[in-house]
Curated annotation (Swiss-Prot):
EC number in record: 3.1.-.-
Gene Ontology MF, one: 5'-flap endonuclease activity
Protein name, as recorded: Structure-specific endonuclease subunit SLX1
Cofactors: a divalent metal cation
Function in brief: Catalytic subunit of the SLX1-SLX4 structure-specific endonuclease that resolves DNA secondary structures generated during DNA repair and recombination. Has endonuclease activity towards branched DNA substrates, introducing single-strand cuts in duplex DNA close to junctions with ss-DNA. Has a preference for 5'-flap structures, and promotes symmetrical cleavage of static and migrating Holliday junctions (HJs). Resolves HJs by generating two pairs of ligatable, nicked duplex products.
Organism, scientific name: Homo sapiens
GIY-YIG domain boundaries: 12-95
Zn-finger region bounds: SLX1-type: 186-238
Alphabetized SUPFAM superfamilies for the sequence: GIY-YIG endonuclease
One example of a Gene Ontology biological process annotation: t-circle formation
Entry annotated with the keyword Lipid biosynthesis: no
Length: 275
């Protein structure tokens, strides 16, 4: 992995970012927003409302993007995260966080809220990445992110050709079987795979796993019967470790339609998880 840390996952980019104001007159102010393009969004904020920036940031720049949380399965999931981060007092998931403390800066308060959000349902089980766009402004969170949420540094790179993985690179992996084969069978239930999004396939070289989303989810959740969304598990074919988020993104990479950045995607099943 390069100095920028974890690469952006393949597929559409949905991020929720934290801006920090460098204007001496407004220094210390922050802004939370949603974006599909971090570089362009910062330019819009610094360009004012006429350039597409928010009214709260217009005329108060320059603004710097300090960090961005990305890896959301859909724009709706990211927008719900954005709303809760902006209004922690109104989210029942964050009732335990408490209001801003006396002497606590807006920046520190938003980092405290973020730390709790990454460990609160439903976000605690999403395959998110915490990226410090400005590594020099990095601070340790009051609660460390969950083990499956990696830290990354620097601006998000262009769409990555391969997903994040725990063990060695798969650059020399053999071509995967055609996921669109209408006669493909699930490796777990042996039934024909007819899912519109195609089967989940193991990315490890030589592994021929193909499985229904539900079948593999049930396999991964055997040790967590009370949960609905897996975090990770062992491939039932090659017995190597897999992150659930990587499997989903690999599947989406082959099925996702190209749309304009300004368009919002249809609701994902994780959007039904209440905030």
């Amino acid at each position: 992995m390069g100095p920028a840390g974890v690469a952006a996952r393949p597929g559409r980019f949905f991020g929720v970012y934290l801006l920090y104001c460098l204007n001496p007159r407004y220094r210390g102010r922050v802004y939370v927003g949603f974006t599909v393009n971090t570089a362009r969004r910062v330019q819009q904020h610094n360009g004012g409302r006429k350039k597409g920036g928010a009214w709260r940031t217009s005329g108060r720049g320059p603004w710097e993007m300090v960090l961005v949380v990305h890896g959301f399965p859909s724009s709706v999931a990211a927008l719900r995260f954005e709303w809760a981060w902006q209004h922690p007092h109104a989210s029942r998931r964050l009732a335990h966080v408490g209001p801003r403390l006396r002497g606590e800066t807006a920046f520190a308060f938003h980092l405290r809220v973020l730390a709790h959000m990454l460990r609160a349902p439903p976000w605690a089980r999403l395959p998110l990445t915490l990226r410090w766009v400005r590594p020099d402004l990095r601070q340790d969170l009051c609660l460390p992110p969950p083990p499956h949420v990696p830290l990354a540094f620097g601006p998000p790179p262009p769409q990555a050709p391969a997903p994040r993985r725990r063990a060695g690179p798969f650059d020399d992996a053999e071509p995967e079987p055609d996921q669109g084969d209408p006669g493909a069978c699930c490796s777990l239930c042996a039934q024909t795979i007819q899912d519109e999004e195609g089967p989940l396939c193991c990315p490890h070289p030589g592994c021929l796993l193909r499985a229904h989303v539900i079948c593999l989810a049930e396999e991964f959740l055997q040790e967590e019967p009370g949960q609905l969304l897996p975090l990770e598990g062992q491939c039932p074919c090659c017995e190597k470790s897999l992150l659930w988020g990587d499997l989903i993104w690999l599947c989406q990479m082959d099925t996702e339609k190209e749309v304009e950045d300004s368009e919002l995607e249809e609701a994902h099943w994780t959007d039904l998880l209440e905030t």
